[in-house]
């Protein structure tokens, strides 16, 4: 990671390494979407990321879910909401394996948060989420 950051992290300060990592993942997702559309525009591209995007306590504006666990954005460098908003992915099926009532990551809390994200960005008015 240190060698890669020194070699390819031009324009980023050492304290911005997380942003550099996220941008590398964003570039992969963006380029995959572009290649798929260019090659076979009818193919749909989706992601099945970890179930927690961000915990509420990690977001300055409180927009994260009311959870307490590993996070896509902060720990895995996956900015899933950006991909949805930029329409780089056609669908998002997070890996939500916690049970209803789980103290750190309640199933209902996570599915409702994901539904809110997808509904607010879905132009067709349809979402994938069913309960």
Residue ranges and their predicted role:
Residues 1-88, 95-98:
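Polysaccharide-binding and catalytic clefts of secreted carbohydrate-active enzymes
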């Amino acid at each position: 990671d240190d060698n890669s950051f020194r070699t390819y992290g031009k324009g980023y300060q050492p304290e911005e390494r997380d942003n550099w990592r996220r941008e590398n993942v964003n570039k992969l997702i963006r380029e995959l979407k572009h290649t798929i559309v260019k090659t076979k525009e009818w193919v749909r591209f989706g992601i099945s990321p970890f179930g927690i995007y961000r915990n509420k306590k990690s977001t300055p504006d409180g927009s994260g879910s009311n959870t307490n666990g590993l996070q896509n954005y902060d720990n895995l460098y996956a900015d899933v909401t950006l991909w949805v908003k930029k329409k780089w992915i056609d669908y998002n099926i997070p890996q939500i394996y916690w049970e209803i009532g789980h103290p750190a990551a309640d199933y209902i809390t996570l599915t409702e948060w994901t539904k809110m994200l997808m509904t607010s960005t879905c132009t067709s008015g349809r979402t994938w989420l069913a309960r």
